[in-house]
Amino acid sequence: MMSQPPKVLLLYAHPESQDSVANRVLLQPVQQLEHVTVHDLYAHYPDFFIDIHYEQQLLREHQIIVFQHPLYTYSCPALLKEWLDRVLARGFANGVGGHALTGKYWRSVITTGEPEGAYRAGGYNRYPMEDILRPFELTAAMCHMHWMNPMIIYWARRQKPEVLASHAQAYAQWLQSPLATGGH
């Protein structure tokens, strides 16, 4: 008898989701997975008024938290930043008594507008992606979470459909057994 995969909360944050072919392709096979809750933050909070208690309850109910978003100005879109600042509050996720996320897993799934070569010393963006994502890794550590290797889709809007489909298949496959196939 196969054991159930851990529950995954996929926090999707893209302010122009309708224009992101890459993210639509990535999300399509994921929608079929019963143990994955896809939570579109921009659809849920168009006014940016985040229901902190609801979000914290979602976090409590899931073992793996996936943050899927485009890379915006070397960070995440504004609503996700607001979400991180408000939901991962002291006393809940960090600080005195803040252990609600201890032992859970964090994985960033990110699309970029530039090719991989732009993210290196001497490249257009001057730093490797690992350095650019360091604030997310530090946030995971602050929340006592395990940091998993991020999935990066470079130059997302310029990828051929078959390349995006391959990324989507790998993503869905990882989500089927997220703790068994590397990623951390």
From Swiss-Prot:
Gene3D superfamilies assigned to the protein according to its UniProt record, in alphabetical order: 3.40.50.360
Record-linked InterPro entries: Flavodoxin_fold, Flavoprotein-like_sf, K_H_efflux_KefG, KefG/KefF
The EC number(s) this enzyme carries: 1.6.5.2
SUPFAM superfamilies linked: Flavoproteins (SSF52218)
GO cellular component assignments: plasma membrane
One GO process term, biological-process aspect: potassium ion transport
Pfam family name, one: Flavodoxin_2
Localization of this protein: Cell inner membrane
Primary localisation category: membrane
Keyword Cell inner membrane found: yes
Annotated catalysed reactions: a quinone + NADH + H(+) = a quinol + NAD(+); a quinone + NADPH + H(+) = a quinol + NADP(+)
Assembly and binders: Interacts with KefB.
Function comment: Regulatory subunit of a potassium efflux system that confers protection against electrophiles. Required for full activity of KefB.
Entry similarity comment: Belongs to the NAD(P)H dehydrogenase (quinone) family. KefG subfamily.
Name the UniProt record assigns to this protein: Glutathione-regulated potassium-efflux system ancillary protein KefG
Lineage: Bacteria, Pseudomonadati, Pseudomonadota, Gammaproteobacteria, Enterobacterales
